[in-house]
C-alpha cells in the first residue's frame, strides 16, 4: 500500500508522554515516524498508509496536519 508523508502539529497542551503514545499508536498502524519538532511547535513528521490518514483527523490531541512538501522562502530562479 502507498505511503504519504505528513507534518503533524499537536495541541500546545500535549505533554511528552502523550506525544510518545500518539507516535506509538501510529506506528502500530504501519506509520513511520520521522523528525520530532519541539521548538516552534509540538509535532512530528510521519509517513503512513493513505488509509490511515483518518486516524490523524480523528485524534483529539492533533491540532493540524498537512502533506509534507518542499517550501521556499524566496523566489527560485
Swiss-Prot record:
GO biological process: protein catabolic process in the vacuole; vacuole fusion, non-autophagic
Gene Ontology CC annotation, any one: nucleus
InterPro entries associated with the record: PBI_I9, S8pro/Inhibitor_I9, S8pro/Inhibitor_I9_sf
Cellular compartments annotated: Cytoplasm; Nucleus
Recorded superkingdom: Eukaryota
Domain Inhibitor I9 as annotated: residue spans: 5-74
SUPFAM superfamilies according to UniProt: Protease propeptides/inhibitors
UniProt entry keywords in alphabetical sequence: Cytoplasm, Nucleus
Predominant cellular place of this UniProt entry's protein: cytoplasm
GO molecular function, one term: endopeptidase inhibitor activity
Entry similarity comment: Belongs to the protease inhibitor I9 family.
This protein's name: Uncharacterized protein C338.12
Native organism: Schizosaccharomyces pombe (strain 972 / ATCC 24843) (Fission yeast)
Taxonomic path: Eukaryota, Fungi, Dikarya, Ascomycota, Taphrinomycotina
